[in-house]
């Protein structure tokens, strides 16, 4: 039961990132619009009083605010899109369902606009009236206040309707309404039923949420911030942190703005107070990120670099510099956190506790800084320094310096004391268990506890996914010794990151379990092991050119933790602008994934490159891809390898960003050129 629940929570957490991703743009508009008529700034720059500038700032501020005012609707649409694989029909169904659900609740409970607004003493217009917290006016519909929870509920139901009925067949005379056209219709019926149920079920839930928020925010907010910081960081590896922080950011707490409207949620309240120009009382559940993201984690990265073996310092230095800089500037910490999460969990435990204290210290000091993207330097400028007099943002700097010192010395001590295998301190290559290509799936199956211990077997281009019967029978250390760069365990679900070999290992394991292939003889193993150095002893320099027309981005910006964390190797991200992927060098095609979304190439000097077209494109089952080459075919630099329907990928995949990584960089140096605009003739990387 837990395993199924975890899987569903992962999907929901990922779906919530779609509406959350809109908030940085809205927050920037709101922050800059508000800053342009900030009294202190206007005194310094009187030209901001110009009528045109005032109009522009007002438009920017209003444009940002309208997004925060309609978050429930955005969560409904975004959740449906995320859970239905990005299909627009599910989004339309969620929109229709959300409106119908709110209209139903309003009619069942006989809610009118007079029940929502009651004229306050001296109020002359509706906008000055006090608002009834239990009710809301949603897009002109008087209804029950369900907040973002209502949007998430309706979005999830719309996605369920889509997944259940998108391919339904109807009698010929109703054929027009068959398939996807049926989804909004059935969602409307479900929305009516949901509205009726929520009319009676939501008020006690609402009372419970209000009581919980009052307890957390009023009884002991100091302790609450500490616990919040610990749990939020603890859930990062499982991708469930989005679910955890959403109630705190979008529901808990309340504030009545200058227009008399009730605003709920720590993040939304902070934005409303920014617009009203009042002292900040919100921000307790965002401010704590700044010290450890901007200062603590980069210092931890330096400690990891310092403790790397001398011959590995150059490689580890590049990895830690890029990951630390990413954390400082943007607040994206996963590339750095995942570099030590698997190999040194004790360091992640230290990090989690320090993150909790960061939230605690910021609250005790009265620092209140909002956030939309993450707690990096960019958000710090927009929401902290531009409002330093109200946010007390300058205190982040001395606190951050203290956290940098603490992080550095604790990580340095723990790495040396416990002999942790952080990047650059891994066991020597000779200590890794030898396993030939033919024998590897047998060894992995044995490490997983044997075929009797396998409940479900799956894989993608980056990782082997196995659900086991008894986790105690799994030899995690053995799996890593066989070449997995990391093993993620959640309940009985194991994810072993073998890179491009994962799918082949899965197919071979399936054949072994069915009896189609048997274990190779010792003679076979010996022969294959003696052949392995052919691939390891790469000589010379390999120039790697762009795989097409587009943009080159750092690998740390690729929206996938396995690639961004460099678990499969180093390289770059490529954003294609034309639907043709070409060979980056002269070499041989070693692998074409069955679903055509990934290609493995080998240069004449033995450098192996993986081109993974888009993110999560394995789920497209080959749709949108046309392979122009075959395995073992010799190719020349610039030769077309794959035709890609970019429009289809943009509509059906999370991202078209294409990681291009070197998978056998051991004992080699990678030089990445300072290139942004790319075409097939432009050099982007060199392996020496």
Curated annotation (Swiss-Prot):
Residue ranges spanning the membrane: these are: 12-32, 81-101, 137-157, 182-202, 223-243, 284-304, 315-335, 340-360, 364-384, 395-415
A GO molecular function held by the record: kinase activity
The signal peptide annotation in the UniProt record is none
> How would you describe this protein's topology in the membrane?
Multi-pass membrane protein
Q: Which cysteines are joined by disulfide bonds?
A: none
In what residue span(s) does the PTS EIIC type-1 domain sit? 3-427
Q: What is its main location?
A: membrane
What top-level branch of life does the organism fall under? Bacteria
The active site lies at: 460 (phosphocysteine intermediate), 612 (tele-phosphohistidine intermediate)
Gene Ontology CC terms: plasma membrane
Q: Describe the location of the PTS EIIB type-1 domain by residue ranges.
A: 438-519
State the Pfam families in the record: PTS_EIIA_1, PTS_EIIB, PTS_EIIC
E.C. number? 2.7.1.-
Q: Which UniProt keywords apply?
A: Cell membrane, Kinase, Membrane, Phosphotransferase system, Sugar transport, Transferase, Transmembrane, Transmembrane helix, Transport
- The protein depicted here goes by the name PTS system glucoside-specific EIICBA component
**In which organism is this protein found?**
Staphylococcus aureus (strain bovine RF122 / ET3-1)
């Amino acid at each position: 039961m837990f395993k199924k629940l975890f899987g569903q929570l992962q999907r929901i957490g990922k779906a919530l990132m779609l509406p959350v991703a809109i908030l940085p743009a809205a927050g920037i508009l709101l922050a800059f619009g508000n800053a342009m008529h900030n009294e202190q700034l206007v005194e310094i720059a009187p030209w901001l009083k110009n009528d045109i500038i005032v109009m522009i700032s007002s438009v920017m501020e209003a444009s940002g605010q309208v997004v925060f005012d309609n978050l429930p609707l955005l969560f409904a649409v975004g959740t449906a899109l995320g859970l239905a694989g990005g299909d627009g029909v599910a989004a339309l169904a969620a929109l229709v369902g959300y409106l119908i659900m709110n209209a139903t609740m309003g009619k069942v409970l006989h809610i009118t606009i007079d029940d929502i607004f009651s004229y306050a003493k001296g109020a002359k217009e509706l906008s000055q009236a006090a608002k009834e917290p239990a009710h809301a006016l949603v897009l002109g519909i008087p209804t029950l206040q369900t907040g973002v929870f209502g949007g998430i509920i309706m979005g999830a139901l719309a996605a369920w309707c889509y997944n259940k009925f998108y391919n339904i067949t109807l009698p010929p005379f109703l054929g027009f309404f068959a398939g996807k056209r049926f989804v909004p219709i059935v969602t409307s019926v479900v929305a009516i039923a949901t509205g009726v149920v929520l009319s009676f079920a939501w008020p006690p839930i609402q009372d419970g949420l209000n009581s919980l928020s009052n307890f957390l925010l009023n009884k002991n907010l100091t302790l609450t911030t500490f616990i919040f910081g610990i749990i939020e960081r603890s859930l990062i590896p499982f991708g469930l942190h989005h679910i955890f922080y959403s109630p705190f950011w979008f529901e808990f707490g309340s504030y009545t703005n200058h227009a008399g409207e009730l605003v709920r949620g720590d993040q939304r309240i902070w934005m409303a107070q920014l617009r009203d120009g009042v002292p900040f009382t919100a921000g307790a559940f965002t401010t704590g990120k700044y010290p450890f993201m901007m200062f603590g984690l980069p210092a931890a990265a330096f400690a990891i670099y310092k403790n790397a073996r001398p011959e590995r310092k150059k490689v580890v230095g590049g990895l830690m510099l890029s990951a630390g800089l990413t954390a400082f500037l943007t607040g994206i910490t996963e590339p750095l956190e995942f570099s030590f999460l698997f190999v040194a969990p004790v360091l992640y435990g230290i990090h989690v506790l320090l993150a909790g204290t960061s939230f605690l210290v910021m609250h005790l000091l009265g620092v209140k800084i909002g956030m939309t993207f993450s707690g990096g330097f960019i958000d710090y400028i927009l929401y902290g320094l531009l409002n330093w007099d109200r946010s007390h943002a300058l205190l982040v700097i001395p606190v951050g310096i203290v956290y940098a010192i603490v992080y550095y010395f604790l990580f340095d001590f723990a790495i040396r004391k416990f002999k942790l295998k952080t990047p650059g301190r891994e066991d020597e290559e000779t200590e890794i268990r030898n396993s030939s290509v033919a024998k590897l799936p047998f060894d992995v199956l044995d490490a997983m506890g044997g075929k009797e211990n396998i409940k479900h077997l799956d894989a993608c281009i980056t990782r082997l996914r196995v659900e086991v019967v008894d986790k105690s029978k799994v030899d995690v250390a053995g799996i890593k010794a066989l070449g997995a760069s990391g093993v993620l365990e959640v309940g009985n679900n194991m994810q072993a990151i073998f890179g491009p070999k994962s799918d082949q290992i899965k197919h071979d394991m399936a054949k072994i379990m069915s009896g189609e292939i048997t274990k190779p003889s010792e003679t076979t193993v010996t022969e294959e092991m003696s052949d392995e150095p052919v691939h390891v002893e790469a000589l010379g320099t390999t120039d790697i050119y762009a795989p097409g027309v587009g943009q080159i981005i750092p690998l740390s910006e690729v929206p996938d933790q396995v690639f961004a964390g460099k678990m499969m190797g180093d390289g770059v991200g490529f954003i294609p602008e034309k639907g043709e992927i070409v060979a980056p060098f002269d070499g041989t095609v070693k692998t074409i994934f069955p679903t055509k979304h990934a290609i493995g190439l080998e240069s004449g000097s033995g450098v192996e490159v993986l081109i993974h077209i888009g993110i999560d494109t394995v789920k497209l089952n080959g749709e949108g891809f046309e392979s122009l080459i075959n395995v073992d075919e010799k190719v020349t630099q610039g030769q077309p390898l794959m035709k890609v329907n970019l429009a289809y990928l943009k509509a059906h995949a999370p991202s078209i960003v294409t990681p291009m990584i070197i998978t056998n960089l051991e004992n080699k140096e990678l030089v990445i050129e300072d290139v942004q605009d790319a075409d097939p003739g432009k050099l982007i990387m060199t392996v020496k």
